[in-house]
Amino acid sequence: EGLPGRKRSSLRRWAIEDKVIMGYTSPDKKFYHTDAFTDYAIDRLDEYKDEDKPFVLYLPYTAPHYPLHAWPEDIAKYRGKYKIGWDKIREQRFKRMNEMGIIGPNHKLTPSASKAWDDLTVQQKEDEDLKMAVYAAMIDRVDQNLGRLFTKVKELGEWDNSLIIFLTDNGAGPEQPNTTPDIPPGPVESYRTVSVGWANASNTPYRKFKSTDYEGGIRTPFIAHWPGVIKPGMTNQVGHIIDVSATFRDITGAKYPKKILGNKTKPPLGKSLLPIFHGQEREPHKEIYWHFSRANAVRQGDLKVVRAGKAWELYDLKADPTEMNNLAEA
């Protein structure tokens, strides 16, 4: 069985306990990915609760990736909250991010990448409000389940002894595989996504989206919690996903294997985040690279070159963090 309302050359599969099951979702009407993932995570914590050595729990929720599916009670919390539109929400978020110190005076709000909200019809605005309500409901369910997980960690007496990292892999995406246009987002029968306007608002104040190497595609949230080690606050030091493994090895004393399945490994590229967690200045990466399809970028210090299948562009991210002034054209 393929995806609902979508023609594919291959079938989609899901698996539980190493058993591959055909079909795009569970036949259980009460099944929801985020809930199920958390159930299994809690079971794993119970399984390893008596271990003396450190453990790592990797919990990769699929939410809020499309398709937009959420429980009705979660959707109801957010219905109507997005009718002011993506333009005003971008402005509000930009203002609040400045007030919170998340961004600074050099950050400029990039031009809108979508149709103006005021140009939509009343029905279109209603439809867009529902899309974002479902998207928010999916994130709400993530929050609920993280609460369940954290409660379990506390019950095991490991809260003060645990480093918790919460992050996402990329910026919001503009993809539009809305293959069930006659079915509103929310139920399992639908296959809908958020619009470009909402993806643009999600990436405030940066340019572009997922699948590009502009800041809107690669600059993502990273939250770390470790009682007694990490003090509340924010840092502007640059990190990368490759640093996570290096950090875990630094904390636990684990060694990177020289061979895996008989094959020699290459030296890992990540740098431990532990100095940053301790409030210290970490020696930065000499350079960081990104590549996805036709998108490429290299960052050295504050300078970044980036392209999307065309000519290279150059930006000074300290003076121009939202990539508004292409120095290659100067």
Pin down the residues of each PLM region.
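Histidine-centered active-site microenvironments of extracellular/periplasmic hydrolases
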Residues: 1, 69-70, 151-226
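C-terminal cap/loop subdomain of S1 sulfatases and analogous C-terminal strand-loop tails that border
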Residues: 1, 187-215, 229-319
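Formylglycine-dependent
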Residues: 1-75, 79, 84, 98, ...
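Flexible glycine/proline-enriched surface loops and loop-helix/loop-strand junctions
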Residues: 19-27, 75-79, 126-132, 186-189, ...
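Outer-membrane beta-barrel transmembrane strands
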Residues: 37, 134-149
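Loop/turn elements at helix/coil->beta-strand transitions in domains of secreted/extracellular proteins
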Residues: 50-57, 158-164, 201, 283-285, ...
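Secretory-pathway/luminal and periplasmic proteins that interact with or process carbohydrate-rich
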Residues: 51, 64-70, 171-178, 279-285
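Short, solvent-exposed turn/loop segments enriched in Gly/Ser/Thr/Pro and often Arg
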Residues: 57-69, 108-117, 166-174, 290-294
